[in-house]
């Protein structure tokens, strides 16, 4: 693996970044600053133009194939099973910025032909996760031998996927050439947050009392949603 340094704050559109990065056949773009502060204006005011300028520079200079990480927050407050062909109604600055980036890149295809795969990520967990994420907090409570773990009511329904599987799916999506556009990267299995925590404890042979309802439910995401995996399965199974 060759690591090539790049600082977004020193971006210069006069530079040919496609050549700088060794003229890659495919780029998988995962970078995005400021998370998990989903409601910060930073996403639209700074991240959106910054990442659009960088990606279009690559494309203008010859990049033929681009895969970008999107987010389930592009669907907004819609509930139930979320499919890629549904209208998007992002309700927070992070979701709005990602949706705007996707739309602008799709418009850019009118000037420069390239393959665009937009991977909508749902809820990931595993090695390297944010220290303030649910399981990170739970692991700390267990390590500290705490008797009680404070959490929300736990009845919200989510779609969880191990980060290793998320990465595997992203690579499969990026390498194939049959399906472009938006692709959900999720399990397709709805589960309550309470069930998710209980299963995690069971798998790790751990016990701790769950103080349900200590935290309010987030107001920036719907109560019950999960992803449709029909399109993802076609990619993974080479259909």
What are these regions (language model features)?
Residues 3, 66, 116-119:
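Hydrophobic/aromatic anchor residues within beta-strands of the central parallel beta-sheet
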Residues 8-47:
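NAD(P)H-binding glycine-rich loop region in Rossmannoid oxidoreductase-like domains
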Residues 29, 52-93:
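Conserved Rossmann-fold NAD(P)-dependent oxidoreductase catalytic core, especially the SDR/UDP-sugar
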Residues 31, 67-71, 91, 120-122, ...:
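Active-site beta-alpha turn of Rossmann-fold NAD(P)-dependent dehydrogenases/reductases
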Residues 36-43, 77-82, 130:
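Conserved catalytic-core motifs of eukaryotic protein kinase domains, centered on the activation segment
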Residues 93, 97-100:
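Active-site helix of classical SDR
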Residues 103-158, 163-167, 171-172, 199-201:
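NAD(P)-dependent short-chain dehydrogenase/reductase
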Residues 144-239:
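C-terminal substrate-binding subdomain of Rossmann-fold SDR/epimerase-dehydratase oxidoreductases
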